Amino acid sequence: MTFINPVLIDIPMPIRTPRLLIRPKQVGDGAMTAEAVAETWDELHRWMRWAERRDAFTPEAMEIRTRHVMASFILREGIELIGQEAGTGEAVIWCGFHDIDWQGRQCDTGWWVRKSAQHQGFATEAANALARYAFGALGMRRVGLTHSAGNDASRRIAQKLGFAFEGIQRGANILPGGKHADRHCHARFDIAGMPDLSVQW
């Protein structure tokens, strides 16, 4: 197989679903992200390793990080996205792909939903769209999904979307405060049998 420099790989954007417009992060997203992090802090601090200190997520700090993320997107090192509700334009979900292996054509996906938009199916819709996009637009062979033990919301989405349970890595996830949690691993290798969803890019 001929190796292609990842920088030259086309990543068509945005991704559209019936309720979401999912796009790369852009200049000016920092304040909006800081607001969503503050709103959702209790849940993020429970599950996300990066949610260690609340005072670290200022609008300025988030804008700086946004611009680093934009550079990573151009270099194809990471794909961090924001999902906006199609009808209102409100940002409701932060999602994307990480641990991308372009040569092996595999990656992991993940997300978090701001508190005011939870329990409305946005995570399931976005995860479905991202899996379809990974296989259809990015040519991935494997899409992984992991979560910490006890994160039942993520487990239910993995099951609902037909991600195969691959096993448990004991104590592999580090949570805020240095706590360790078992990592539950799921994966898909194609979109066969996934719930129907209209996705365009």
Regions found by a protein language model. Name each.
Residues 53-54, 67-82:
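A short helix-loop-beta-strand connector motif used in the catalytic cores of GNAT acetyltransferases and
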Residues 43-67:
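Conserved GNAT-fold acetyl-CoA-binding loop/helix
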Residues 1-32, 36-46, 80-201:
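Acyl-donor (CoA/ACP) binding surface of acyl/acetyltransferases
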Residues 25, 36, 54-62, 75:
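Generic, well-ordered alpha-helical segments
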